[in-house]
Curated annotation (Swiss-Prot):
Keyword Chaperone recorded: yes
Region (Disordered), start-end ranges: 71-90
Name of the protein this chain belongs to: Urease accessory protein UreE
Pfam families: UreE_C (PF05194), UreE_N (PF02814)
Residues spanning the membrane: none
Organism of provenance: Kocuria rhizophila (strain ATCC 9341 / DSM 348 / NBRC 103217 / DC2201)
HAMAP family per record: UreE
Length: 180
């Protein structure tokens, strides 16, 4: 099977409707693999899938539905049809992306001045960061970066509050290319 588009996301109503009543196979990926448009994937049922997204396609995200297959007609090699766990005939299969948690530092600076200092200092290292507001799952305004022991040392040295966590990030961290 070759996947050429993202059909929806199970974290949204339309994506949940796509997979409702279907057997869900998962493709488990680390965050770094989400940015690759062309790759070979393997489901948790050991099925191989080719991914060939067009240029300009968005990065993969946790919960993306990349394939939906209808159930084989009764008597077509599946006995009395696929089951969805309720005892009712199933609607077929769906393949969904599941992202592994990323080791991150969640930085909760105490003021906008402290956050600007941290962001500027880490920006000079060309480190990718994601920012979240108080309405996010973090419940506070925070900056999140991939774990790096030198960043942890920097934060400790300057007394900046942070916590090290494993998180499924909403968007992948990208490598920051830079030349002088």
């Amino acid at each position: 099977m070759i996947v050429t588009e993202i059909l929806g996301n199970i974290h949204e109503d339309s994506g949940r409707e796509l997979v409702a009543g279907r057997h869900v196979e998962k493709v488990v990926l680390p965050s770094a693999e989400l940015v690759k448009r062309i790759q070979r994937l393997r489901t948790d049922h050991d099925r191989q899938i080719g991914l060939r997204l067009p240029a300009g396609a968005p990065d993969l995200r946790d919960g993306d539905v990349v394939a939906v297959e209808d159930a084989a007609p009764s008597g077509a090699g599946h006995g009395d049809g696929e089951q969805d766990g309720t005892g009712a005939p199933g609607r077929g299969n769906a393949v969904v992306i599941q992202v592994l948690p990323t080791d991150v530092l969640v930085i909760g600076a105490r003021s906008v001045v402290e956050m600007a200092f941290v962001a500027h200092s880490l920006g000079n290292r060309h480190l990718q960061a994601q920012f979240f507001d108080a309405d996010s799952e973090y419940g506070a305004e925070v900056m999140v970066v991939q774990y790096d022991h030198t960043v942890q040392d920097f934060l400790d040295h300057h007394g900046v509050p942070y916590s090290r966590q494993e998180r499924v990030m909403p968007v992948p961290f990208r490598h920051a290319e830079h030349t002088h």
